[in-house]
Amino acid sequence: MKISHYFEWEDTITGGFAESVNNQRTIMDQRGIEYTTKPDLSADILHLNNLGPRSIYYAKRAHRADVPVVAHTHNTAADFRDSFVFSNLLARPLRPYLAYGYAQADHLICPSDHTARVLDSYCDVPRTVVSNGFDSAKLDGHDDPDLRATYLDRHDLDPPVVFMVGHVIERKGLAAFVETARRMPETDFAWFGYLNPGGGTVDRLLRSRTTTKLVRESPPNCTFTGYVDEVAGAFAAGDVFFFPTKNENEGMALLEAMATGAPPVVRDIETFAWLDEGETALKARDVDGFVDALRSLLDDAERRASLGRAAAAESAAYELGAVAADLLAVYDGLLDRPVVPER
């Protein structure tokens, strides 16, 4: 059994998008599934992770060769907005383009129920919800007090620290993050992640003026660390995960934060309907609400720990070992036989 697991523009795309692709390949490695990262029509299934023009070309060729095509729906026009310079302008033509691209697949994989519902207006291709999951191995050491001390000292942070992990873009709730920090001058806020969309020097040109202005004019207690080479260090340093994102397909950093026992404060959006308010997360819709939610946790260490424990327990269902069966079931269905034979 062989999967052609193609990720167009793999060398330039970073963040959760790339992490999801890595997770899929980790699952295949762990399950002993043969795959190639090239578009190969001699494979049993063509799995496309980014519907660029080359992917659509190979999807059409796959149909002619009677090779089933599955597409991962990492992108929607809505979550493309407020990402980088010109993204809002490009979001309008992107929607019909994605609708056309996704329609070339025999089956779609959606990272959340929310994304699956959004795609109802794109095409009528059958779809299955499969979480992006998270690789718990990359979080090893997050509970190491020495690593925590190193990252707190490196970024001049005093605990308890409110933190976020991910690309610094408007869609992730940058304005709310900065304003909430401004309202809470007694608390250190840290955003760990690329300041440029792709992380590179050239990508600085893609950063929107609004993003640049918000970062430049952020208050002294709001730190933007840039890329960190050991993500476990970010989770070691942080105490409350603050995710005021305006639109999200799933939110892999949220799953990782929950797994480390960091209680999450999130924006109350449809994507996070699966989180129980007051049980596994606190939710708010504006800066006033975020301030109240964060202070309620920062002022009560026992509640902070209790919510963190519940979040960690909830996250177990999203570990790679737990979501692997869902991904393989999609492959099984396309071939009408098990991808991994019983032993």
What are these model-predicted stretches?
Residues 89-107, 212-214:
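Membrane-proximal helix-turn-helix segments that form the acceptor-binding/catalytic region
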Residues 134-153, 159:
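Acidic anion/phosphate-binding donor-loop and adjacent secondary structure
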Residues 153-172, 178-184, 190:
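Conserved donor-binding/catalytic core segment of Leloir-type glycosyltransferases
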Residues 188-220, 225:
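Short, structured helix-loop element that forms part of the nucleotide-activated donor/catalytic region
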Residues 227, 246:
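Aromatic "clamp/platform" in nucleotide-sugar-dependent glycosyltransferases that forms part
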Residues 263-266:
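Short hydrophobic beta-strand element within catalytic cores of glycosyltransferases
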Residues 277-288, 295-302:
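Conserved acidic donor-binding segment of nucleotide-sugar-dependent glycosyltransferases
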Residues 303-317:
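A short, well-ordered alpha-helix in the C-terminal region of glycosyltransferases
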